[in-house]
């Protein structure tokens, strides 16, 4: 469960036109730590059971496929950050490389992600709470979490940075402890030789490309947010070198954590057909390797992470809608309103809360995850194409390493991302393409048949 930091937008500064220069103080190691915090070492937990099931027990292999797509895309983000060091975002890259119209649709796809982050966080928090207290129905948990998140965001209470740091330390401890206990369990029950086994990675009798790629498309959720490193380009001492390096290394480190987790988890619970509940399978594995104590520890971790993600996700989404309403991209009277006392976009928060509640009741967790990844992969594909258009075509950097960096790498990233993107389920693609079509219709109306340039929202850094 991921979320962008909605507290980053300071409305008073935006409205007063603050143009101060940010000091460049961040090193590549600062960027790496930031990226790992954003991705979270426990990001694999909510989707493990789903990936393991749809990939026919080959979740580790699905993560390796997802890594390939992410590595080439990470390199492309690094390339684009060298050109736009003061505004690192998919929206900025696409708008400036292609056209404001394509940039608008890229931003429209990202809006889908902002809507789904708090929604899928609420769904998973409710599923986890229902495992802890099954006497309370799932739908009641959904209502309670949605209401609580809405009240906190309306009142403007923000999560403290210290609390996030402590949470990161706890989640890292949890990830290391889980892997260590899984290794111990396999060693005790199956012997040392069982720790290195092909069944944790590849099952020839169940292998099929389609399920593997579907697993990769869902596993990509564990990488969502790595591109946020590029938003720190203006704060970085050497953005042209360090952004790309840090983004690629973060993807590699995240893969190591995820693959180690799913590999040993699959050795502990080899028969994925017997998961009591697919969405919370990681809790059952935790109970097997660490008893009730680890089960409760994992449950609390997932609950806190889910609520935290929902809080920051809704804050980011409501402020994005506020920025778009303020700039006239969407109705100003409805979305461009700030509460006079709390200073928060309350109308946008109410709307996002209602949509999140309805979505959590009507939508399965897997579909929410796939839709979130649908929007993300639209951005990933476009950023890879931006590198080709900007460096290979417009700048003509085609010789030697230029051919590799500006054509082969980004086109490989775009093709792998496209393949993974198209491997999403039919329902996810249907809803995703309908969303893009709605964006195209809105853009046509808003620009009077593409005669006018689309409005550009100053809140673009949120995307």
PLM region spans:
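A generic transmembrane alpha-helix motif of multi-pass inner-membrane proteins
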Residues: 180, 371, 375-376, 404-463
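Alpha-helical transmembrane segments of multipass membrane proteins
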Residues: 47, 128, 147-154, 179, ...
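Helix-loop-helix connectors at the membrane interface of multi-pass transporters/channels
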Residues: 1-6, 92-95, 101, 121-142, ...
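Membrane-interface "cap" regions at the ends of multi-pass membrane proteins
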Residues: 1-49, 53-58, 64, 70-75, ...
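Hydrophobic transmembrane alpha-helices that form the core helical bundles
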Residues: 47-53, 62, 71-154, 159, ...
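Helix-loop-helix junctions that connect adjacent transmembrane segments
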Residues: 17-22, 59-60, 137, 166-299
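TM-loop-TM module centered on a large, flexible mid-protein loop between adjacent transmembrane helices
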Residues: 92-93, 99, 131, 246-311, ...
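Membrane-interface loop-to-helix entry segments
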Residues: 139-196, 247-251, 372-382, 409, ...
